[in-house]
Amino acid sequence: MKTKELVIMALFAAIGAALHSIIPPFLGGMKPDMMLIMMFMGILLFPRVQNVLVIGIVTGIISALTTAFPAGQIPNIIDKPVSAFLFFSLFLLFRKSRKTGAAAVLTVIGTILSGIVFLSSALLIVGLPGGFAALFAAVVLPAAVLNTISMIIIYPIVQTILRRSSFMEAAK
């Protein structure tokens, strides 16, 4: 694991924490998880197992600290590392394509998987303030759309910045 990679992933985690904090909760304390975009970006740019583990754990802890979901700390800590490795597995299937379209498809699938993991773990550990299907439809699906649109906008910008800087070697 390189220091450059850690620094960039730390920046992604910080940006994700800021986004996660400012998005207001709705429907039983649930809110779209903007932290996922930054976690996914870290995985797309630095696809190594140790990086996936680090960014998954860090985003899980930060999400747990900033959650608006009642007793959502443990489900967040479970969700992020599991989702990080699921996303990484999907990435390995589509490794040849580093295009924005592939990132968008991976983001929508990753967000939906993350929502399923979070809601399932919350259901088993603390219960849900509403039905699984209602929360999935009202929070996870809109979050998948929002995250995908955000990834389509942000990912090419980050790639351009890294390409123009000395960090692009770290992102290969």
Curated annotation (Swiss-Prot):
- Cross-referenced InterPro entries: TrpP
Q: Where are the transmembrane segments?
A: 7-29, 49-71, 104-126, 136-158
Which terms in the GO cellular component ontology are assigned?
plasma membrane
Superkingdom as given in the UniProt entry: Bacteria
Q: What induces it?
A: Its translation is regulated by tryptophan-activated RNA-binding regulatory protein (TRAP).
Q: Which UniProt keywords apply?
A: Amino-acid transport, Cell membrane, Membrane, Transmembrane, Transmembrane helix, Transport
> Could you confirm whether the keyword Phosphoprotein appears in this record?
no
What Gene3D superfamilies does the record point to? 1.10.1760.20
GO terms in the biological process aspect are: amino acid transport
User: Gene deleted: what happens?
Assistant: Cells lacking this gene grow on 40-fold higher concentrations of the tryptophan analog 5-fluorotryptophan than the level that inhibits the wild-type strain.
Membrane topology qualifier: Multi-pass membrane protein
Major subcellular location class? membrane
Query: Would the keyword Electron transport turn up in this protein's UniProt record?
Result: no
State where the protein is found. Cell membrane
What does the protein in this record do? Probably involved in tryptophan uptake.
Q: Which family does it belong to?
A: Belongs to the vitamin uptake transporter (VUT/ECF) (TC 2.A.88) family. TrpP subfamily.
**Which protein are we looking at?**
Probable tryptophan transport protein
The species is: Bacillus subtilis (strain 168)
